From Swiss-Prot:
<comment type="similarity">
    <text>Belongs to the class-II aminoacyl-tRNA synthetase family.</text>
</comment>
<dbReference type="InterPro" id="IPR044136">
    <property type="entry name" value="Lys-tRNA-ligase_II_N"/>
</dbReference>
<protein>
    <recommendedName>
        <fullName>Lysine--tRNA ligase</fullName>
        <ecNumber>6.1.1.6</ecNumber>
    </recommendedName>
</protein>
<dbReference type="GO" id="GO:0016740">
    <property type="term" value="F:transferase activity"/>
</dbReference>
<dbReference type="InterPro" id="IPR012340">
    <property type="entry name" value="NA-bd_OB-fold"/>
</dbReference>
<dbReference type="Pfam" id="PF00152">
    <property type="entry name" value="tRNA-synt_2"/>
</dbReference>
<keyword id="KW-0648">Protein biosynthesis</keyword>
<keyword id="KW-0030">Aminoacyl-tRNA synthetase</keyword>
<dbReference type="InterPro" id="IPR002313">
    <property type="entry name" value="Lys-tRNA-ligase_II"/>
</dbReference>
<keyword id="KW-0460">Magnesium</keyword>
<feature type="binding site">
    <location>
        <position position="418"/>
    </location>
    <ligand>
        <name>Mg(2+) 2</name>
    </ligand>
</feature>
<dbReference type="GO" id="GO:0000287">
    <property type="term" value="F:magnesium ion binding"/>
</dbReference>
<dbReference type="Pfam" id="PF01336">
    <property type="entry name" value="tRNA_anti-codon"/>
</dbReference>
<dbReference type="InterPro" id="IPR018149">
    <property type="entry name" value="Lys-tRNA-synth_II_C"/>
</dbReference>
<comment type="subunit">
    <text>Homodimer.</text>
</comment>
<feature type="binding site">
    <location>
        <position position="411"/>
    </location>
    <ligand>
        <name>Mg(2+) 1</name>
    </ligand>
</feature>
<dbReference type="GO" id="GO:0000049">
    <property type="term" value="F:tRNA binding"/>
</dbReference>
Amino acid sequence: MSNEEINIHEAEEQLSEQEMLRRQKLAELQEAGKDPFDVYKVERTHSSADVKDNFEELEGKEVKVAGRLMSKRGQGKVVFADLADLPGKIQLFIKIDNVGEEALKEFKTFDLGDWVAATGEVFKTKMGEVSVKVTSFELICKSLKPLPEKWHGLKDPDLRYRQREVDIITNPEVKDTFIKRSQIVKAIREFLDNRGFLEVDTPILSPIAGGAAARPFITHHNALDIDMYLRIATELYLKRLIVAGFEKVYEMGKNFRNEGVSVRHNPEFTAIELYEAYADYNDMMEIMENMIAYVCEKVNGSTKVTYEGTEIDFTPPWRRITMVDAVKEFAGIDFNEIKSDEEAQAIAKEKNLEFPKPLDKVTKGEVLNMLFEEYGEDKLIQPTFLIDYPVEISPLTKKKRGNEMFTERFEGFVYGREVCNAYSELNDPIVQRERFEQQAREREYGDDEAYMLDEEFMSALETGMPPTGGLGIGIDRMIMFLTDSSSIRDVILFPTMKPQK
C-alpha cells in the first residue's frame, strides 16, 4: 500500500458515520450519472425574497429558485422543504403527482446542507405560506459535512470564528451583521464622495512603519533584499498626496499592528483616514459627527442606537472636553497647577502609573495622558471629543493656538472606547524633523512604538503642504456600536485566531 493510500485510509477512519453516509450517497449519484459537481451554472430566475415580495404578480407562474436545503418535513406522497438563500428562505412543496415516484424518492435522500435548484409554480399553502409547487429539481452540490444540530446551531465562540461559513449558515443574525457592515462601509464612502473627497490607494508594504505609534509586522523582500513593514497607518502617504495638490483624499483599507488580541483589538483591522487641505481639527470634528449621524440614519433609521443595553445618541454636536478638564473631572487633579515634569512624576508614582521608560524620563504631558487613560477614558459613554492633547504624544500635530504645551488634536470616544483620532496636521518640516528626532530618543529609552523617521515624507513636507486637517477612524469599532456587537471578532468575517494544535 502506498503512502497516499495509507493517508486516504486514515482520513476515512476519522470521518463520522454521517460523513461516510454522505460520501456513499455521492458515489451512488456519480455512478447513476447525476454527479452534482458536474453542474456548472444554475439559471435561477428569482430569489426567495423576489418570490415573496412579488407574490401577487408571480402567483401561478413558473419560477426557478436555488439554495441550501435547511429542513425537510413529511413522508409518504408529500414533502415540504426549506431552501435558504441570501435574502431568506422559501418553502418547497414536493408532491408525487407533480414530480413522479422516483423523483420524490430521490429528493428524500437529500441531506440537510445540500444545495438544490427547483422549478415550479408559485402558490400559497393552506397555512398562508408563499411556496413553490415543485415540478422538477436538481442537486447542484452535495454537502459532505453535516451542519450543526438545527436548534442549537454553532454556539462555541472559538468554533464560530474558525468556521465562519458554518456560523453564518446556522446563525442568521451573523449574516445580518455582515450585510449591515457592508451597508455601513458603503454609506461612509457615499458621505465622503458627496463632499468631494477622492478615494485613493496607497502601499500596504512600506520600507518605514510610519503614521502611528504601534508595533509593526516585519517581512523581507527577497528580490530587493530589504526588510519591509505592513502598514500601521496610511497617514504619511496621504499627506504626500495633499502636497501633490489633491485637496480632499481618503483611503479605507487594512492596517496591521503586531500587538495584543482582545475584544477590541485584532492585529488586522479596517480603518479610514481622510485629509482635507485648508482645514483644521474643528472641521474634522464636524465631518466625524455628521458622517456618523448620516451612516446611522442610512443604516439604522435613527441617530440613536442601543449598545449592550445603553442608548447611545450620535446626534450632533458631540460633547467637547479638553484632556486637562477631563483629568480634573475624573481624577480630581488640576494640571493647570502642575508646573514641572518632576511634580507630574511624583503624581505618577503616587498613582502607581506604569510607563515604557524610566519614570525620570517621563514628561508632564505623558503623565496627563496616562491619568486620563486610567481614570477618564471609561467614563466617556456618550459620543465625546477629547481635545487638546499634550505635544509630547502628538508628534504629527500642530501646537494649540495660544498654548504651546498642547496640540490641536482630538480623539473621539464612545462607550469608553476610542473610535477616531484627528489633528490640525503639522506642516512645518523643521519642527516635524525635531519631533521625529525626539521620537528616536524615545525608541532608545525602550519605547518600540515610537514613530520612525521617514525621509521620503520629510522631503515631501519640505516641498510644502498647506494647512490640513486629518481624521482617522476605526471602522471595526464603529461597526460594533452600530450592530450591538460586544467583540471586534463579531464584526470581522475571519478574525485572527491562534492555530489549533
